[in-house]
Amino acid sequence: MKKLILLLFTSVVFFNSHSQENVSHTSKTKVFLLAGQSNMDGRGDASKMTKQDKKELKLAQNNISYYYKGTTNNIKEPIIIDGVLDVTDPWQYVKKKFRIEKCFGPELFFGIELAKKYPEEKFLFIKRSEGGTSLYGAWNPNWTLEKAQLKKEEHKRKLYEDFIETVDSQLENLQNGSYEIVGMLWVQGESDSGNRYGPLPTETYAENLTSLINKVRVHYKVNDLPFLLLGVGSNKVISKMKETSINLSNVTLIERSFNSYDENFTPRYNHHWNGKPANHYNYTGMKKIGQLFFENYFKFYSNYIK
């Protein structure tokens, strides 16, 4: 009888310690923030996804919750996804322009790779994006009417403010202490490139990006929050991203290539729409972008997921 009691006690102790070990490893939901313009929105053609892609997405959906708010010009109602990681049913003009029915952004294959590497973890992705928007104007954390007017964005939403409100509203659904913010992905820069509206958007890009990063970190009380930038836009804008990544800790610039021989090759659509190149990253390009985000996060910041 004493042996039986001892055996039961030992089993209970082992079970409890084993359960606590699992809880300590998986108890907190890991939150990623995503923001930017149309290439963060994503135009990757979901119909090109392979059977293996779909299988891996289905597995990732067990681990990754996903909230997405996307807006666009002249359409009042946003696209909202509030569920698990998935592809997007976009606006009709996007379907026509890119000859697609459904699409995806960097989050999809970033999430697929993340779930494969961390099958025991739970994640929440919160994404806020709007195409054709600048950091100088709509995304500026130090928004002014004058800056917005310079970029013809005075009638657009104050996107930094809206981004914070969107993230806050989703975090309020979680219990205090049940989550930790472990990274932010930023895909934006095209609208600050060129000289159509003068040199200021490009010249002040590093200053505005630094302000955005610092304000996000302060607001969410994560002073060393990993911040990953995709190098998009003009060479001058990308050089400003590089400058920011050198001057701030835990900021990584992800370089992509249009050379098909490079490992970081990110091809774009090659057809025209209304007499202009459609541009934007296609299935292969957007898939690679998601994978590049994961590779860089895992290389530099894997210690944030424990």
Language-model segments: which ranges?
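Bacterial Sec-dependent N-terminal signal peptides
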Residues: M1-E21
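Cell-envelope and extracellular/periplasmic
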Residues: E21-K306
